[in-house]
Amino acid sequence: MATPGSEATWLWIGTIGMVLGTVYFAVRGRGSTDPEQQTYYIITTLIPAIAAAAYLAMATGLGVISMPIRGTEVIDIYWARYADWLLTTPLLIIDLALVAGARKQTLYKLIIIDAIMILGGLAGSMMQQGAVIRIVWWAVSTAAFIILLYYLLGELSERARSRSAETGIVFNRLRNITLGLWALYPIVWILGTGGGFGIIAVTTEIMLYVMLDIGTKIGFGAVLLESQDVLQAASHPSSTNDIKSH
């Protein structure tokens, strides 16, 4: 276990932000009786709840380990961050898949690709052999993200538009939030401690991750749950071509 330094302030901000997001989504969904809407509320509430636990672990040092990289030099690995992403990014993908009415086979592919993306980043951050091997793992992770980009811009966007024009508009909004913010993660990673270059300070790196996480988890969820028409469309009898029927 390592003790966070000045970055602890941002880790606590992340913890509080995720707790507030969890409470907000839970209160919003409390009165919902529609099964499809409940599914959205449960998934969307779980996302910041998991992130809150991860940020609490990092803020208290439980989610951080110190690893030697060169001689006596050590680097702090925030493993709880990757545990968070490994659990929450598939939930975000499931939310998108529900809105789009994606096929089960497609959803399974996306979850596997997503896991490769996250684990590639974790593997790179733990490598001690130098910058080259870290960049290789960064490239693996980034390639997986590009494949996700292909599916979200292609098949899922088409399926969302086929459900209704409004569903297509809301899906595009959610997709753009997700992809736009996710595209910034590998940049922060390669410039920070993950890539081993340390171009940006640890505190700045943590701050950027907190801001990105709040946007992708709470911002995404707020936009989704404000789109009540899409939640209703998902439970419409004519929308049977979704992930529950394939």
From Swiss-Prot:
It is a multi-pass membrane protein. The covalent binding of retinal to the apoprotein, bacterioopsin, generates bacteriorhodopsin. The record marks 84 as: Primary proton acceptor. The keyword Amino-acid biosynthesis does not apply. The modification N6-(retinylidene)lysine is found at residue 217. This is Bacteriorhodopsin-II-like protein. Keywords: Cell membrane, Chromophore, Membrane, Photoreceptor protein, Receptor, Retinal protein, Sensory transduction, Transmembrane, Transmembrane helix. It comes from Haloquadratum walsbyi (strain DSM 16790 / HBSQ001). The keyword Calcium does not apply. The chain crosses the membrane at residues 7-27, 45-65, 82-102, 107-127, 135-155, 182-202, 205-225. InterPro entries: Arc/bac/fun_rhodopsins (IPR001425), Rhodopsin_retinal_BS (IPR018229). Has no proton-pumping activity but is potentially capable of functioning as a sensory SRII-like protein. The chromophore contains 36.5% all-trans-, 7.6% 11-cis- and 56.4% 13-cis-retinal in the dark and 30.1% 11-cis- and 47.7% 13-cis-retinal upon illumination with >460 nm light. GO terms for biological process: phototransduction. GO terms for cellular component: plasma membrane.
